[in-house]
Structure formats: C-alpha cells, structure tokens
C-alpha cells in the first residue's frame, strides 16, 4: 500500500510538472493528450470510466488571462472530475459526478461570441441540451447522445460536439453519427414485425411457471439481435409481473454493459427498433431517406403512420408532429 501511494504521488508530480512546463496548453488538453482520465460513450451516455491518478486539485493561469481549476476525486467509490476554465471571452465547466451525473456548460464573457450551451445528463432521465441566452433558449431532449445527434444534427455539430471532443479528440462524434445513420438506412428490410413478435413471446415466457422455460426465454433474449435492447427499454413495466420485471431489468443491464465505447454497428443495431429515431429520419431533406423511414415506421408501429413523405414541407411537419404525439402516447 505504501509503495502504491508513493508511486501514485510520483506519477502526480510528473504530471503536474508537465503542466507547469507547458503552461500555455490548457490543463484539459494536457489531460486528454496524456490520457490521465478515461472517458467513454457507453449506451449513448457520456461516462468518466476511471483515472490514472488519485485525488488531485490543480490551479493554473497564464499571461493571457486564462484561469483554470482541475479537481479529480473519488465520489462514493466512483471517479469524479470538475474542470473550470475562464478567459476574456468565455467560461467553460465540465462536472462529472457519481451516478452517471454530467453537466457541461459554456457561456460567453464580455464581448465573446460563444452561444450559451448547457448539456445535462442525469440518471434514468433524458439528456438535455440547452442553447441560447436565457430570454431566447432552445432546449432539446433525447434518450441518448446518439438520439440527440440524429434528431438535431446541426445544433449538435455546431455547439455540443466541439466541446465534448475536448475530452476525447479521437471521438469524431459527427462522423460516427453519420455512420450510424448510414447503417440504419442500409440495414432495413428485415421482417421487423416477426422479430418483435418473437421478442414479445419470449418476454411472456419470462413469467412462465416452469423455471426451465423462464431460463430459455432469458437466454434467447440475451442472444437476440442487439436492437432488442431498444425494444426492452420501451416496455411498459407496469404490465409485467415481478419475475418478468426482474429478468428484463437484468437483461437490459447486461446488454448495456457489454462494451465500454459504442461502435456505429452497435448503435445502429440498438436504434433500429426505436420509432423516435425513424421519426427524426422522416424529417430529412432526402426523399429516399424519408421514404425508407416511413416504411420502417409502418413496420414498427404496425399501422399507417399518417405521414406522406412526398407532401409539401409544411404538411409533412404537421403530420410528423401528429405522429410524434401518437408515439409518445404508446
């Protein structure tokens, strides 16, 4: 234990010395470059997985007026980090706390032209991206970061992605979202109704009186196409008995934790069964994309969607909002 503490202290001393030697480089950039903190996007949630140092608190400033504070700590047994940076034009905050809590805020200062931005991620809640000053705010909500990037590509590319990629410059989030969308459009055409019918039968079987039947259904759902995860998350748990609820939650937890960093293939497979994703694609400018999305929504919902992808833009918008209300009621 003593040797471990000494080694950690030695690493920390080297790290802080490197910061001091490169004071013109922001602390967060240095931390990202040397990978002292491990960030990932898992199941569409931004996560601080771990750190290579213990508790640290560092302050830094330079001649140009930039001031920074970096605090890395243990929060209820989980890694946590707060980073604040201010200069003449803007202030920036990253706050990662235990329990999947993330808050990122960017605000202009003085004559700064930065658009105010806040990104909030809380446990078991939708992500919220808020843009604009207090008297003219626009808020976007989504089930995951990938939902948000697909539903609101331009605001995200312009305001959110550049800030998130300060944590991991190799993320290439806009490029990954484009690959997800491409795979979604290329991967349609299977018998969605038959697939969902099989899943529904297995979920029903999770409540069977015979243990062997319940175990067989459990194994089948775990081995199903990755898009089953989205289907399971949309279930109305109030309609399931206690055994079904217990098993479905365990399956969701297991499937959600299979990879530490989302890949385009995994994301596309997961989102392919989510009507809200296809509703977003139904609003794309490309006619072929709208037509594909319309067909997929009919298959997923099992009924006419009431949206004509060839209608004039105003009519399409009205019809999509009506469809959105129907989807949210389900």
At which residue positions do the language-model features occur?
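N-terminal secretory signal peptides that target proteins for export/translocation
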Residues: 1-5
């Amino acid at each position: 234990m003593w040797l471990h503490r000494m080694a950690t202290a030695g690493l920390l001393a080297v790290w802080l010395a490197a910061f001091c030697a490169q004071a013109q480089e922001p602390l967060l950039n240095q931390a990202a470059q040397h990978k002292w903190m491990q960030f990932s996007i898992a199941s569409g949630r931004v996560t601080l997985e771990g750190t290579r140092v213990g508790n640290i608190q560092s302050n830094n400033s330079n001649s140009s007026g930039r001031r920074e504070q970096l605090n890395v700590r243990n929060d209820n047994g989980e890694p946590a980090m707060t980073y604040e940076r201010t200069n003449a034009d803007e202030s920036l905050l990253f706050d990662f706390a235990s329990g999947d809590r993330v808050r990122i805020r960017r605000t202009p200062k003085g004559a700064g032209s930065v658009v105010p931005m806040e990104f909030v991620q809380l446990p078991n809640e939708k992500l919220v991206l808020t843009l604009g000053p207090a008297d003219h705010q626009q808020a976007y909500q989504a089930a995951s970061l990938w939902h948000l990037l697909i539903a609101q590509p331009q605001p995200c590319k312009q305001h959110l992605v550049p800030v998130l990629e300060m944590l991991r410059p190799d993320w290439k989030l806009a490029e990954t979202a484009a690959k997800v969308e491409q795979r979604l459009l290329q991967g349609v055409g299977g018998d969605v109704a038959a697939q969902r019918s099989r899943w529904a039968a297995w979920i029903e079987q999770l409540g069977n009186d015979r243990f062997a039947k319940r175990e067989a259904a459990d194994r089948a759902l775990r081995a199903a196409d990755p898009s089953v995860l989205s289907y399971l998350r949309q279930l109305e748990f109030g309609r399931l008995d206690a055994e079904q609820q217990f098993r479905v939650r365990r399956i969701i937890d297991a499937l959600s934790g299979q990879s530490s960093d989302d890949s385009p293939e995994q994301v596309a497979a997961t989102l392919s069964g989510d009507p809200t994703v296809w509703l977003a694609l139904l609003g794309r400018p490309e006619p072929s994309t709208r037509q594909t999305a319309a067909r997929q929504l009919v298959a997923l919902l099992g009924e006419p969607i009431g949206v004509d992808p060839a209608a004039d833009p105003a009519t399409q918008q009205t019809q999509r909002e009506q469809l959105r209300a129907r989807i949210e009621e389900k």
